[in-house]
């Protein structure tokens, strides 16, 4: 390897930041159950402590994404505690994730629900999350919507599009300067007939309808088998609509395996598309790289370190491609 190549790698890695998910350090499972790990995080302080360990060993993870209902159950009242923990452990709060899928009222959806009172409940929660983000100095709000239906004819797909457009415009109008709304998509699960935001095109159209501070978030596990994710990334780059990633690997669907454990070449191709765009335009992209994984069998901290290390290695390899 030449001196220039070595310098290229170090320069690329100096700019790479990967956000850790608070929920990735806690006990998680499948619908069949979960295996308890004695070292899994229980409290928000445990999560900050574990994230700090990963950051200490990788040097690339200065922020941790928070899930409001799980990490800040008392909303704004908990922001003071979060600030103290962030200062103590040297890891800042990152993207703020609303929870509009867990409560019983969301059986038929959140902001796509045909019941106006439930749509209002979901929107009120998301607007509260914006205030939490402002209090913590967080830029990105990353809602994932499980909204959809399981059977034909049970919901009006077109009406629900309108509900989403209306609701997301209201959320966008409440964004502070510099804040971003990142819209995630997923083709299926938990809805199996139709999902309201099922692919990148739907997410992009809704983001554009919401306003200029709304972008698309790509979860690498939220795609059909053999789908060309780097082509999706290229389209979003072309339209300047890509805001972030949720990194994980999969064999079949949204398996949430450690990044690069199944298809590292795909991760390389995604990074290559982004770095090629930066080389071609001479502009750095403003993309939030985040992890979203469920470590049911592996140790939590070890799995995070594996993921970050794999991302760094593949990003470095992509940076070495000579576009001339």
Label each PLM-derived region with a short phrase.
Residues 113-118, 148-159, 187-192:
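Surface-exposed cleft-lining segments at the edges of enzyme active sites
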Residues 24-26, 68-72, 97-102, 145-149, ...:
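Active-site-proximal loop/turn and secondary-structure-junction residues that shape catalytic pockets
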Residues 38-45, 113, 120, 162, ...:
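Conserved phosphate-coordination/catalytic loops
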Residues 129-155, 179-184:
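Active-site groove signature of glycoside hydrolases
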Residues 1-25, 29, 33-36, 52, ...:
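Histidine-acidic metal/acid-base catalytic patches
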Residues 1-134, 317-324:
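N-terminal pre-domain/capping segments
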Residues 59-62, 107-110, 148-150, 183-184, ...:
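A short alpha-helix capping/helix-coil boundary motif
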Residues 83-94, 115-125, 160-174, 200-209:
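Acidic, His- and aromatic-enriched active-site or binding-groove loops in soluble protein domains
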């Amino acid at each position: 390897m030449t001196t220039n190549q070595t310098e290229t790698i170090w320069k690329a890695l100096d700019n790479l930041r990967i956000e850790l998910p608070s929920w990735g350090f806690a006990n998680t499972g499948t619908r069949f159950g979960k295996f308890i790990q004695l070292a899994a995080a229980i409290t928000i302080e445990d999560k900050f402590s574990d994230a700090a360990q990963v950051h200490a060993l990788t040097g690339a993870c200065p922020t941790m994404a928070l899930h409001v209902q799980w990490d800040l159950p008392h909303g704004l009242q908990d922001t003071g505690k979060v600030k103290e923990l962030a200062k103590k452990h040297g890891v800042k709060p990152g993207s703020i994730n609303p929870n509009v899928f867990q409560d019983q009222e969301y059986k038929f959806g959140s902001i796509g629900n045909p019941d106006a009172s439930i749509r209002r409940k979901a929107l009120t929660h998301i607007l509260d999350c914006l205030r939490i983000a402002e209090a913590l100095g967080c830029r990105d709000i990353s809602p994932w919507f499980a909204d959809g239906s399981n059977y034909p004819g049970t919901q009006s797909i077109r009406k629900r599009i309108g509900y989403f457009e209306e609701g997301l415009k209201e959320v966008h109008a409440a964004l502070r300067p510099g804040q971003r709304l990142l819209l995630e998509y997923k083709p299926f699960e938990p809805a199996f007939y139709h999902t309201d935001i099922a692919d990148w095109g739907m997410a992009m159209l809704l983001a554009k309808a919401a306003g200029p501070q709304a972008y698309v978030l790509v979860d690498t596990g939220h795609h059909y088998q053999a789908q060309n994710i780097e082509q999706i990334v290229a389209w979003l780059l072309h339209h300047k609509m890509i805001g972030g990633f949720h990194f994980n690997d999969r064999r079949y669907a949204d398996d949430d395996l450690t990044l690069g454990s199944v298809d590292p070449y795909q991760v390389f191709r995604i990074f290559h598309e982004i770095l090629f765009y930066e080389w071609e335009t001479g502009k750095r992209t403003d993309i939030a790289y985040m992890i979203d994984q469920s470590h049911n069998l592996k140790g939590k901290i070890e799995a995070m370190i594996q993921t970050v290390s794999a991302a760094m290695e593949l990003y470095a390899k992509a940076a070495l491609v000579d576009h001339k």
